[in-house]
Amino acid sequence: MGLSDAEWQLVLNVWGKVEADIPGHGQDVLIRLFKGHPETLEKFDRFKHLKTEDEMKASEDLKKHGTTVLTALGGILKKKGQHEAEIQPLAQSHATKHKIPVKYLEFISEAIIQVIQSKHSGDFGADAQGAMSKALELFRNDIAAKYKELGFQG
């Protein structure tokens, strides 16, 4: 299920665009996640009280968390699938502390692709979208495998 060198290059090329504004992209990803899948908001004590998009946009905590999420994801993507060391602590915290189901990782993956498409459509054609989808699926599958090792049925 791995990606070819050419696919990784497509992923990293568009990720460079994301990195030009990690806070803005991260905020947009979380807002899209919470609006599209309101049940995910319940996993975030710091954000549960945010009911409207305007409230979400005004939240510095939400923007900071979006930055954290996309910074971590960028570090994982740059490993081109060799991300064991990065995945382990992430799976540990998301399984044992946050109890984030794999389904929610699918939801945020969708949000990431939608945000990149809306902000960088000229640099995110079908090939790049397909490569990013594969990279995010690889990430999710590896997280799911770690969840299983940890006994989390997420």
Curated annotation (Swiss-Prot):
Its chief place of residence is cytoplasm
Residues modified as Phosphoserine: S4
What CDD domains does this protein map onto? Mb
Could you tell me the superkingdom of the organism this chain comes from? Answer: Eukaryota
Question: Residue ranges of the Globin domain?
Answer: 2-148
GO MF assignments: heme binding; metal ion binding; nitrite reductase activity; oxygen binding; oxygen carrier activity; peroxidase activity
**Binding residue positions for O2:** H65
Q: Where does nitrite bind?
A: H65
Q: What class of enzyme is it?
A: oxidoreductase
Q: What interactions and quaternary structure are annotated?
A: Monomeric.
What's the family? Belongs to the globin family.
PANTHER family hit by this protein: MYOGLOBIN
* Protein name according to UniProt: Myoglobin
- Per the record, the gene is MB
